Design a protein with these regions (language model features):
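Extended, low-complexity intrinsically disordered regions enriched in serine/proline/glycine/threonine
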Residues: 1-17, 21
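Core, soluble structural subunits of large cytosolic macromolecular machines
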Residues: 14, 20-22, 26, 44, ...
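Extracytoplasmic beta-rich ectodomain segments of secreted or membrane-anchored proteins
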Residues: 19-61
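Short flexible coil/turn linkers enriched for glycine and charged/polar residues
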Residues: 22, 65, 91-94
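Short, intrinsically disordered, mixed-charge
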Residues: 44-52, 78, 117-128
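Ser/Thr-rich, low-complexity intrinsically disordered terminal regions
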Residues: 52-84
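Active-site-adjacent structural patch at catalytic or cofactor/ligand-binding sites
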Residues: 71-78, 84, 91-105
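Well-ordered alpha/beta subsegment
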Residues: 98-161
Length: 161
């Protein structure tokens, strides 16, 4: 029904709005090894792994049935992180991708594991490397460290690396 469709869309909007009210974030950064990515390649790879453009000019990844926001992606620029401009994306060079998980999160383990997996798949596809939010190469040890921080996160807590 029309009402069901509206409520479904509103649920997605509410989930995305969680980004604006998040207390903390865990981020993974993916940088190509040699040179900036073309905007066209960036768009293709994000879409290939199920990310959709949406609120705050980010790409968002949802759970399997599309009802729960798992994580989002911004582009990395010379001045930091920024949203994507779809009008100019095909011609913009992209220096890197910032994957981020808003905390607290109702399905944090699945969200973190999906973000970790997709960031590594994309890094492999663009001949890049995954780094943590402190720009340390994302080793298996760091992966476990950040995964436990995400899972153990409690409202009001600071994320300390």
């Amino acid at each position: 029904s029309i009402l069901d469709a509206h409520l479904y869309e509103q649920k997605i909007v509410d989930d995305e709005s969680a980004l604006a009210t998040a207390e903390s974030f865990i981020a993974l950064n993916v940088y190509p090894e040699r040179r900036a990515l073309s905007g066209e390649k960036t768009l293709k790879v994000l879409m290939k792994y199920g990310l959709r453009f949406g609120e705050m000019s980010c790409f968002h990844r949802y759970n399997e049935d599309g009802t729960k926001l798992l994580f989002s992606v911004l582009q990395i620029t010379d001045t930091g992180m920024d949203g994507f401009d779809l009008e100019n994306l095909s011609t913009d060079p992209i220096k890197g991708l910032a994957f981020f998980l808003a905390l607290p999160h109702r399905d944090v383990q699945n969200a973190f594991d999906t973000m970790d997996s997709i960031s590594r798949l994309i890094a492999r596809e663009i001949d890049g490397t995954v780094y943590d939010q402190n720009n340390q190469e994302f080793t298996p040890q760091l992966r476990e460290h950040w995964r436990h921080l995400a899972i153990d996160y409690r409202a009001g807590q600071a994320i300390d690396a």
